[in-house]
Amino acid sequence: IAKKAAAIQISELRKINKIFDKSFVQSIELIASCKGKVITAGIGKSGLIARKVSATLSSVGVSSFFLNPSEANHGDLGQIDKRDLLLVFSYSGNTSEISNMLRYANRFNIKIIGVASKKNSLLLKASDIKILLPQVKESDPTGMVPTTSTSITLLFGDCLAVALMNKIRFSKERFKVFHPGGNIGQNLLLVKDIMVTGNKLPKINVNKSIYDATKVIDQKKLGLVIILEKNKIKGILTDGDARRGIKYYSKDDHLKKIM
């Protein structure tokens, strides 16, 4: 059953190529030129996809948030600014909860990118840019549970984000700014991002005492001190070496003695 479901989805997802038309290009250009935020919206499974698309857009430098149409109907329409644009998802395109949001956007000339699978749907009729998703076969035994339809909608969202990255020349350096945490953040981390430089470096002259060295180690909290002679590095003294060295040397002995 699972293999059959996977096979159905793999086959149906190939239909995604049908959406890469003039409307898709226009949606990229509109989002790239947006002066406000990209507000994604949807109900049910489409709402979950809209949340994910918003999160992806945010991670690639496109300011975005998700707005629940039901909450919008009860006062949250005020979150939408005239500089924003709506990216609304509804596979059928006729979800009743989105109607008030669409009317509000049309009334105040807020641009709408509609993503649906029915050409004459409520959503696409109200949209400035119409993304017509291909109608696909669901992969469950009843053919009714949103499975393939959610997959192809999510695939559209990912393709949209990737195309936008190219349009706005999004780089690894910018991605690092938006994604400092997790495995991705670690993989993007450079030595220069964590290295200690300048006055933060624990440095001491070779003619200073072991005791002076331990004070610098304690102050800088890096576990070691760099020993200099005529501004050239002669070596390092670790916290452990300094503590152990005091057993054999006087704390007033110069560092030269233990180098």
Describe the residue ranges of each PLM region.
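An N-terminal, well-structured beta->alpha segment
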Residues: 1-33
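Terminal peptide-recognition signature
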Residues: 9, 42, 87, 160, ...
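Short acidic active-site motifs
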Residues: 23-27, 72-76, 212-213
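Glycine-rich phosphate-binding loops that contact phosphosugars or nucleotide phosphates
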Residues: 32, 36-155, 159-164
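Tandem CBS (Bateman) regulatory domains
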Residues: 171-199, 234-259
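The conserved cystathionine-beta-synthase
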Residues: 203-221, 246
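Short hydrophobic beta-strand segments in globular cytosolic domains
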Residues: 228, 233-234
